[in-house]
């Protein structure tokens, strides 16, 4: 069977830059699935993406499906014919579905009986016939939240489509996709190269686009070029470019032919906090800021043009003129805001709604102030500083700078607090209250900041759950999942002595009578324990290990972490598998027991040597392990409990649990319950697979 290179390119208007990669990757994944489902042999599927195109190139694509033998078994002979030997309706219906008559069917005989059988040799369809529908289906499944319609057509896509190129080797596959007839015409760069040209063979892509169209279609190559050129440009001015991955991706999705240039701004703007300047450069203009080796912002920025200019100074000058008013605004806001103390903004918080049922930002501030102070007392932080940080926590939201540059919330609070002469840990807490903002983000750096960050997140969790608006599906408008995970990370990684039960109860108490959900405390704790499951799975822990610990519903996050590490280590022990199985057996036995058990094991009722020995071990371990459990030394406890393997095995091998004598039976069940209770002090290891 011959194989050829296949190319599909969809030429469009400018695609959404933040979605470009996901569109291309989804297109490739969808089309690969279509090929596999159709049984079309193929090699590597490579995707390409630029602002005005999505493309796939498939190596070694078979020109047709393989032929295949089809067998369809019909009704049993007894049901296929009546007493007179005439075909039944069931047999005729089956035959019609196969495109034959009953008398054309074969018969299949086995040890179990005889059936009608249809056999056929089905010739594989050509790739040329199959591909158009595959491409259309793959495009229809792209993750596009909002579709566009253009012109008089009723075709919908993420952006208007101008060209569709479908080539199998050197042949155009005729098709109409997204309202466009397929061809071998490709459009180049808007302002450089050839505006349109033809491609003779799929193997020429993407090199022909580079040479004739001045477009780097390879997304990763384009991104790598921007990164390398920006690093070199920064090095030339003695600095380091801030090449954050998200901005690098976005810029790579905005240009087809990247040209990296360096510009500057007036040094006087460096008096403004760097975060505000960086927000303007990165957020609004898509520029890369430059820092010196000490991490101080330089009065330069690097940007990427989408054209090779004969006079680059014109482009540089234009970008400098664009950014200057934005930096001047930041300077004005900074100077204006500092004429007031942060505390002076408190009354205005009363005019901003946090949530309709939960009150204003001033109401939230009062709750955070109280909760941060309470948490500080629990974790040994400065209570006065924590309450002060809580009072000022939302004041910067009322400043001109944060109103204009929203991503500077928190960090501007820190700068203004320092200007006002607030304690340094209070100022830092105002910035770090929102941390961690995302997976892997830094945690608050000092105890006051930890108290404020936890208070802010717990207030939101308690309030939103308290009015029954918990996350549903993918919808999480108040970012409760992130808030819950943030609280857990801070408590676990900072090893704070906080209990989710009392923490949630305190957060709920501060709402007074505003909450309507009577089960809010349990709902919040269950939700947070659910975040543990996702977090620890990402950390590489097995699902059954997590379930074994969650079964105990430990509400102290640091304690949960200690149990997880203990069970994970326990699984490496030679005795673990046998003891997990024994615990499962004990759990099942106790679940079926209907008689009330004794409070203690009565030594006088023990008869068999194996049960006497097990009881002796349990008494010794119970006394020995109490300090271990009290101190959270769960790993050491499980190592000690591993010594029970031999007496437990001996017990089950030689002792009849459900003895006929009631007192003996109940005593043995009580013995097993005491065994299980010891393990349950750490986790339910019966859940380990």
UniProtKB/Swiss-Prot annotation:
GO cellular component assignments: cytosol
SUPFAM superfamilies: HD-domain/PDEase-like
One MF term in the entry's GO annotations: ATP binding
UniProt keyword list: Aminoacyl-tRNA synthetase, ATP-binding, Cytoplasm, Ligase, Nucleotide-binding, Protein biosynthesis
PROSITE patterns named in the record: AA_TRNA_LIGASE_II_GLYAB
Catalytic activity as recorded in UniProt: tRNA(Gly) + glycine + ATP = glycyl-tRNA(Gly) + AMP + diphosphate
EC number in record: 6.1.1.14
Keyword flag Iron: no
Pfam families reported in the protein's UniProt record: DALR_1, tRNA_synt_2f
GO terms of biological process kind: arginyl-tRNA aminoacylation; glycyl-tRNA aminoacylation
Similarity field: Belongs to the class-II aminoacyl-tRNA synthetase family.
Name the UniProt record assigns to this protein: Glycine--tRNA ligase beta subunit
